[in-house]
Amino acid sequence: MLSQVASGFTEFDPPKGRPSTADGPLGWPGYDEMRARAQDRTGETESVVCGTGRIGGTDAVLLGFEFGYLGGSLGERTGDRIEAAHTRARELRLPVVTLVATGGSRMQEGMRALVQLQRVARQTALTAAAGLPQLAVVRDPTTGGGWATLAAGADVVLGLPGAQAAFAGSRVRPPEADPAAYTVEAQHAAGHIDRIVPEAELPTALSRWLTLLGGSADRPQRPEPVPVPYALPGPTACGRLPDSGPEAVARARAAGRPRAAAYLDAFLTGREELGGDRCSGTDAGVLCGFGVHEGRAVAYAAQCGTPTRPAGYRTVARLVRMAGRLRIPVLTLIDTPGAANGPEDERAGAGPAIAEVFTAVAEATVPITSLLIGEGGSGGALALAAPGRLWVTPDSYFSVIAPEASAAILKRDPDQVPRTAEELRLRPQDAVELDVARGVVETAHGAARTPGVPRPELRPDEE
């Protein structure tokens, strides 16, 4: 598969390993003969082939597993090669792409094989700390330690349709287990794989991701902030600021108001999305990924106007942390009535998930630019707002809680909701006056803005 995804592949010389003993570290009867037969069958001397190649317009270090060599299993010499490949990647400042197809640790080497997972994990951690992106392609099968380190631990995980992907291999699962639970499709639905890609489309998909994430060696330690997008015109009001709290709420909730996808399409090109939180699932109401604005990569996290679920918050936190390591500035688009608050959301860890986002934003090592494009409902919205770098659109509101909920907390009758909305001072211009937001952005056609507030532009020194 290496030749299918990369041009000009040049294999590394195998590292000088430890002295070989007959039949391996355990003296497993017939092990040398097994390796010899595997070499005759595949033409390879180990289960992984490593080298450099070019994917699209990006040079990368590639690791390709050969499942025909003892089931792609990881042994001591496999660990030697993976360690050497990651070391070269850090020396050359190149991203790492791993094409995984493995049954796990090599039985014939026992614990000496199992501890290779620790070596692999250390190497991937060092490469991540060096700010280099790691992509993994899950082929059939990807099980055991290979799934739990090289595949599931990558920044971006792509899966081939129908491939097995699981920690438990097919021969060690419970007999009553549903085979569908151990597939790429199941892992994607659970938020562990970002995208399922047909094999014919894999070179293009890898090229797009490397274009977005590669080049971290050339990025400044502290990149310039993302400029603030213009507001998109809504169905009514033509950019005029709302006169009252109830009007602000009504405009933010209007069915025809532009949503996050429209803003992203207008602001970014070449978008690629992350597909989950790497924990429990996905949230269709949150879009996270990377795109290009005026020639440079931008990470984005955008709420789509629905209550945000725990998986959505964890995906946002994942994105912010990844962007920090890769030195890519972040844009957040805020639009939610609040965090999802059903029993299933509490069981899924709504509080800890929101805390993850607050922490990720507070600790961010790259600048975050935030724009409120619709509803700003309580802490579920505030979690995505960068302190000191928040702007608001004319069709938005930001409130400590939705006015209906506020009235209920204050034990007011439902007919007091409009009064409550007024008293909360939740209009976009109120957010500016209360020093919550820096300004109200202009609409794309140049409508009015808050008097005295200049058109928002972030300068490099505004950090």
Residue spans for each PLM region:
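Intrinsically disordered, low-complexity segments enriched in small/flexible residues
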Residues: 1-55, 203-298, 302-307, 449-463
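Glycine-/proline-rich flexible loop or hinge segments
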Residues: 32-34, 63-71
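Glycine-rich phosphate- or other oxyanion-binding loops that anchor nucleotides, phosphorylated ligands
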Residues: 59-61, 67, 75, 113-119, ...
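A structural preference for long, well-packed, hydrophobic secondary-structure segments
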Residues: 128-129, 303-330, 348, 359-366, ...
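Active-site-proximal flexible loops/turns
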Residues: 73, 108, 251-252, 342
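Glycine-rich anion/phosphate-binding loops
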Residues: 42-46, 72-84, 276-285, 308-319
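Conserved catalytic cores of soluble enzyme domains
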Residues: 102-221, 338-462
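A structural preference for short, pocket-lining loop segments at secondary-structure junctions
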Residues: 53-66, 81-106, 290-304, 314-341
